[in-house]
Amino acid sequence: MSYRLFSISVKLPVLSASLLLCSASLLNAQEKPPTNDASTAAPAPWEQIRQVPMSGGLRVFWNVAGGDNTTNYREAAAHGFEMVDLLNTYSDYPGRQKENIRKTLDTNKNNPWKKPEFFERIIRRNIEQRGNQNAIFVHDIEFSFEEDIDKAWSDPTVRAASKATSREQFGDAYLREWATWFTLPCQWAKERFPGTPVGIYGPQPFRRDYYGISGKSAQQIDGTHQSDAELWKHIDPFVDYYVASIYVFYDKPDSVYYMAANVEENIERTRRYGDKPLYAYEWLRYHSSNQKLADQEVAPWLAEAMAVIPYFCGARGVALWGSEPKRQGQYYQTLPVFTKSLGRVSDLSAKLAAAKLMPDEPAHVLWKARRPLVRRMRVSADEWIILAVNPWQNEDAVSHVEVSLEKSRISVELRGRHSEIFHCRGENVTRL
C-alpha cells in the first residue's frame, strides 16, 4: 500500500464549551451517524445501567456525543466514566474550513516540509477553544502520506526540501518530519495545559489491522507493520498514553481475536519506551465500512467481549466513542450488556490493576488455530483472575478449557460465546 491510511475518523467541532456535540457533517464518510429507527424499542434508561467505577489505575472513558449531551455526560460521569477532551486538530470551523490543514494534504502526499503557513496558528487556536475540562486530551489527527521512501526520494522538490545528501539520511529525515505533524500539536497542548495527559487518535505503534493478522505468522505481521514502528519512534516522546482503535467490523468469532491482537501487538511494541498506559477505543456499532452491518449496534456477545478483553490484554482502560446527533436519552440497546460485563472488571479493578498479566499464546496464534482465547492475571501465587472465551461454539453450547495456575491446573466451563471471567482463590473458583 503506497499511502499510510488511518481510517477511523472521530471528527468533532472546536467549541469553547467543556464537551463537544458531534454533528453528522464532521464524520468521515465511512462513519456516518446512525439514523433513528422508530421500530426499535427505546434503550434502557440510565437508571437501569450498572455503575462501573474504577480504581487502582484502571479507567473507562465516555467519548460519545449526541442529541442529548447534557443527560448522557452527566449520567456517564455518575456511573464511573471519565470524560475526554477530543479535538479535531486540523479543523477550521470559525473560518468555515478555509484554513483546514487536512485539506492541504489532499494535494501533498510526499512533502512533510511543506506545512501551510497557518499550521501553528490554527492548531494553537483550536487547542485554546477546545479547553481543558476533562480527564485526557486527545488530538484526532488522521491523514495519508506516501510510505514509499524511494518514491519520495525520487521527487527533486522533496529531496531538496529535506537537505539530505543520501537516501539513508533522507529516509530518517522524511519520517521524522512527518512525525512533527503529530508531535507539534501535542507539544502545544502541553504548553497550554501543563499536567494534562495528551495523546493522539490516528497513528498507532501498531496500525489497526484485521486481515494482516488473521492467519499470519509473527514474522509476516512484523513485516507489514514495520513502517508503523519507524514513524512511532519519533512520536512516542510527545504522548502520555497510547490509543488502540478496535472498532468492530464483523459479527464473527474472529472479532474477539482481532480486538485482543490489536491491543496486544500495540502493547508489545510500546514496552521498549516504558510503561505508559494504553486505552482501547471502542464503538457500540459496527464500523460503517461494512455496508451489510453499517450503523447497527454490535451483537450482545460482542458488547460483552469488548467491555473486558482489553483489560486482560494489557490495556489500562477503554474509551467508548460514538456519534448520535439525532438521539435523545440513553443511546444504546447494548449499553446495559456492556456495563454489566465491565462491572466485573470494576468490582476487581484494584486487584486487576496490581496483577501481573502472564505470558500466553499470542491472540493471532489462537485465532489461526480457532482455539479459545484465555488470559491469566496473577494477583498472587494463590489468587488469579482468568478471562476465557470460545467464540467458535454455538450460543447454546458448553465446552471446557484447562488453565494452568501457579500451584494447580483447573478446568473451567465456557458457555456459548460468553466472555467468562473466573476469580480463583486457593481451591475456590468463582464465575463472575
What are these regions (language model features)?
Residues 2-15:
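Bacterial N-terminal signal peptides that target proteins for export
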Residues 13-24:
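Bacterial N-terminal signal peptides
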Residues 26-28:
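Sec/Tat signal peptide C-region and signal peptidase I cleavage site
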Residues 30-428, 432:
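Glycan-processing catalytic domains of CAZymes
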